[in-house]
Amino acid sequence: MNENETRKTNYAAIDIGSNAVRLLIKEIKEEQGKAHFSKVLMLRVPLRLGFDVFDIGKISEKKEKNMIRLMKAFRHLMKIYDVKHCRACATSAMRDAKNGMDIIKQIEKKTGVHIDIIDGQEEAKIIYNNHVEHMEDQKGNYMYVDVGGGSTEINLLSEGQLVCSRSYNIGTVRMLNNAVKDSEWERLKNDLAELAKSYPQTNIIGSGGNINKLYRLADKKNKKKMTMQVSVLQELHTRLKALSLEERMEQFGMKPDRADVIIPAGEIFLTIANIIGASYIHVPVIGLSDG
């Protein structure tokens, strides 16, 4: 390719989470030796696989059929957008489902879409690798926290360098199903308390649809730096928790699949913030599918 020529290529990522399944298509424009990324399409479908898995241990036949239908739809969309390469990743619900591997084989057979079931560590690292380029200020200590439906991924950064990646089976859908073990909460609290001793004055970088929504709902925030104080999140969480599901939907324009999980999401972020003594949360609006 000539140095002055522009080449455009579309790539896709599919994120099969415990609450929703997402398709993200991005265009990569290569110009004068530099790559520029732009979002072409983003679709979110609340399949809510975790409500089956964290209750009965497997994905129901109905949701399996819907998964296959959805992957067929995604495949057609990728053809329309002339996608050259796609990576599909399944996380916590598929990891835990007894029939997860069987469903993935069926999906590939019927749709041609290959799905990788990734572990929590890889999930955390994909999110981290995507995040690095979004952060202008890499000085100090940050804990990158991605709260999903089935698990919470944590990356600790110090002076822009990755210190460690951790994954915990604590997620919003798990909490709604009362499926989080006390031992998992203890593991998270003990781990973070130890990290806080070695890395004081750590603040949070929040990832996931719930923290994005909470940030948008917050009355007081720094729009330029995309941050909100933990105290502001606490006030908002208290206000939302006092409302019924229907009231949250009516007063804040939430969809049903957001109005229920936003409460446990707030609890997870606040628990982590209190353990490490964070004063604010930075919300860059990126997640697994962006990586």
Report residues per predicted region.
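N-terminal basic/disordered segments at the start of proteins
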Residues: 7-38
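A generic fold-level signal
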Residues: 6-8, 18, 139, 149, ...
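A short acidic Gly-Thr/Ser loop motif
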Residues: 15-20, 145-151, 207-210
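Conserved ATP-binding subdomain of kinase catalytic cores across diverse folds
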Residues: 34-53, 69, 79
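Short aromatic-hydrophobic micro-motifs that form the base-stacking/packing surface
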Residues: 12-14, 87, 143-145
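Short, Lys/Arg-enriched, disordered terminal segments
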Residues: 1-10, 194
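Helical "lid/coupling" subdomains associated with nucleotide-phosphate turnover
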Residues: 11, 25, 52-83, 91-141, ...
